[in-house]
Structure formats: C-alpha cells, structure tokens
Amino acid sequence: MTNQKISRDVHHLAHRMSGFQESSRIVPEEAPIAMSYNGTTQAVMMATPGDLEDFAIGFSLTENIVTRIEEIEALDIVAFESGIDIQMKLAKQPEQRLSARRRFMAGQVGCGLCGIDSIEQALRPLHPLEECSTTFTTRDIAAAVASLGAAQALNAKTHATHGAGFFRPGEGLFAVREDIGRHNALDKLIGAVAREGLLAEEGIVAITSRVSVEMVQKAVMLGVPVLAAISAPTALAIRTAEAANLTLVALVRDEEFDIYTHCGRIIEG
C-alpha cells in the first residue's frame, strides 16, 4: 500500500482587472493507474490517486472481472515514478472472465469505453434489476444530490473533480468518492459500497456529471434502483436504463428534476 497526494498547491501568474499578480491555487493530482491481474496489466487510466483500493474493486466489479470481492485474493498498490500499479491476484474462476473481456485503455481521463475491441463489448447486455416495492420521495432525490455537492471536499478546494455518492433515505450519504474522471468516481463509489457490504437496492446513487451509457451500466452492475444526476442523459443512456429497469433522474435542481425511466419509484413527498 502507498499514500499518494491527491492535490497540490501550485503558484502561478494570474491576470485580474488590476493587472498581473502572483497567485496560488490548489489543483488535483492526476496519475496513470494500472489495473493488473495475475501479473498482466488489463487497463491503464488517468485518475486521481486516492481511494485506490475502492477504485480497483469497483472497476473489477463493473467490468465483470469479478462478481464478488472475495474473488480478489490479494491486492497491492505499488507506486512507481511514472505512475501506480494496482496488482491483484484473482481466484481461478475469474480468470476465464478476464480472458474473455480483455481490454487495454491508455491516455484518457476515466474513459469508460476506451479500448474495448468490439461493439458487442461496449453495449454488453445487462441483467435487468429485480422488481422491488421500494420507493423514494422527491425530497430524497433533492437531498441526495444536494448532500453530495456539500460533501465533496476535494472539489471544494480545486473546483475540478467529479463526485459520486450513495444515499439512503432517512440516513443520508454513506459514501462519497471523487475523481477527475466521472467514470472513476463512480467505480470508486461502487468499490466503497461493496467493501462496506451496503445493500444497494436501498439507496440512490447521485453523480455530478452527465449520464452516458457507461454510467448507467455501472449503476446497474451495482444493483442500485435509482441513478440521479446533475446534468442531462444521452438517448442511449435512457434506452439502456429503460431496458435494465433502472430509474434515471437527471437535471436535478433542488426538488425540480426530470425522470426519464421507471417513474413509479419516485413519489411526491
């Protein structure tokens, strides 16, 4: 394991109405993070070098490399001058899934579909979420998104990171994760929820970004019934959420928002 700085104070020259002046600003760190399984690098992504164990677990789950945490028998975080290698040892069964869905990604910031070598992999079928009687109020949606923004400590300093949070009605946020990449932030959150053994079907995932199809895929893999976002969804994200029985809420502004799929889970209150 290794502790990595996630932000840095940078001195720079600023231009204001009064002219040029010396200034400083806290900016997020960015580093290449390699996901390696049984001695082979599977993916390399640019990410904020924090909450790396959560990141590795969440990525492994949402990529269907593992189906439960116990299939990762060991996890080591090794820092090099050029980046960080998260080295995982898998049980025997996940190795078959790994070879079937091998992908290599490099150079982009949390690119959710980078390096996938076929359309079938990019739009892989999802098992629809099970029907449940759980409902959430309009206040729950507003509170989930509002509390996420207030809990983003790194973004408060840098104004440069995405956030993802898991919210349970009546209890609040259980986990918040941040990253320069929106996909990375969600993977980190999914890893945190899995590590804590939280019941995903009891809560809402809130995100501070737009909703692309990859964000829907990750939410469905977690098993959460509602995904709520500050920004708008894509048409493909809406179609995917509809098919997967996920309630997709977007453009959340206090208690005003749009519900695109499976509206029955959201009630007035």
Swiss-Prot record:
SUPFAM superfamilies: Cytidine deaminase-like (SSF53927)
Keywords of this entry: Cytoplasm, Molybdenum cofactor biosynthesis
Active site: C111 (cysteine persulfide intermediate)
A biological process from GO: Mo-molybdopterin cofactor biosynthetic process
Pfam family, one: FdhD-NarQ
GO cellular component terms attached to this protein's record: cytoplasm
InterPro entries in the cross-refs: Cytidine_deaminase-like (IPR016193), FdhD (IPR003786)
Protein family membership: Belongs to the FdhD family.
Protein role: Required for formate dehydrogenase (FDH) activity. Acts as a sulfur carrier protein that transfers sulfur from IscS to the molybdenum cofactor prior to its insertion into FDH.
PANTHER family found in the cross-reference section: FORMATE DEHYDROGENASE, SULFUR CARRIER PROTEIN FDHD
Protein name per Swiss-Prot or TrEMBL: Sulfur carrier protein FdhD
Annotated organism of origin: Brucella melitensis biotype 1 (strain ATCC 23456 / CCUG 17765 / NCTC 10094 / 16M)
Gene that produces this protein: fdhD
